[in-house]
């Protein structure tokens, strides 16, 4: 921290400007005042924080997830691929090697190292709330589009999250801009859209979920996925499953197949096929 820097609280609603630093004390001037509720986040834009990625509490939470049989864990504020490797090491050492890791991209370090993070993680979450505080908001839409494309090309799932239907925390209907935001993420190729405050603390959680579902369903009915798929850049170094899935989808499109039936033992082939957005539905059958 340096004098002149800013400390942002609650997604930037409260803005503090650093005036002086004396040992462990930081004297700030309030630029934007507000009431700070419980458990609100604190952001220091531009700061390169040198602190352990996994706290003692994080370690305990991972062990709890293993004990309860979690399918996924999300790694908040992922900065480098080493952060993901650190989480994976703990999972493997404690019998949780089957748990998949979703890297949450929320700051500039994560954006700068996105390629190595995509390779190390099992999926990516574009957490736009903190990202829009750590990074100028006007940059976020372009970053979102680029990350979605990179993750899609890598054959991994990508989740677009935070403030998608934010007004529905207090109102029964979203703004038109919010509906367009959800639709645009789907058009860009996101694997999933996610609600947070709308369902965790909102007055209309069920209505928010139903609204997002309707927007997604309508968008998918009106997107030419086959054309987009043919124009999309392929992974330059595909593994066998990725290559087979890509070839299968091309064949299905050329033959105008009604569906794709994936005969699979582990489920990985069906999973890969489902990540490739084409119009033909995928059916899974185990062996």
Go through the PLM ranges and name each one.
Residues 67, 89-96, 119-123, 148-156, ...:
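Generic secondary-structure signature for well-ordered alpha-helical cores
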Residues 1-15, 81, 105-107, 243-257:
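Phosphate-interacting basic helix/loop segments used at nucleotide- and nucleic-acid interfaces
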Residues 126-135, 182-205:
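Glycine-rich phosphate-binding active-site loops on the catalytic face of alpha/beta enzymes
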Residues 1-62:
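Beta-strand/loop-dominated core regions that host nucleotide or nucleotide-derived cofactor-binding catalytic loops
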Residues 47, 52-162, 168-179:
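Conserved alpha/beta-domain cores
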Residues 276-287:
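Single conserved hydrophobic/aromatic residue that forms the stacking wall/gate
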Residues 48-54, 165-186, 221-224, 228-242, ...:
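Active-site-adjacent loop and "lid" segments of alpha/beta metabolic enzymes
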Residues 41, 50, 85, 102-105, ...:
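Long, charged amphipathic helices and adjacent flexible linkers at domain junctions
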